């Protein structure tokens, strides 16, 4: 059986990267929430 997680740097960046988060209003909300919480890493 093939496992669910098949790592790929490209796909990782394209779906969870900083620039993608900045594109949408909700993505920016995610970043702001993480900033408010004091996360060391805002995005992948």
From Swiss-Prot:
GO terms for cellular component: ribonucleoprotein complex; ribosome. The keyword Magnesium does not apply. The keyword Ribosomal protein applies. GO terms for biological process: translation. Pfam families: Ribosomal_L34. GO terms for molecular function: structural constituent of ribosome. It comes from the Bacteria. InterPro entries: Ribosomal_bL34, Ribosomal_bL34_CS. Keywords: Ribonucleoprotein, Ribosomal protein. HAMAP family: Ribosomal_bL34. Belongs to the bacterial ribosomal protein bL34 family. This is Large ribosomal subunit protein bL34.
């Amino acid at each position: 059986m093939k496992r669910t997680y098949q790592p790929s740097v490209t796909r990782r960046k394209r779906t969870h990267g900083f620039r993608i988060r900045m594109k949408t209003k909700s993505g920016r909300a995610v970043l702001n929430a993480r900033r408010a919480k004091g996360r060391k890493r805002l995005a992948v």
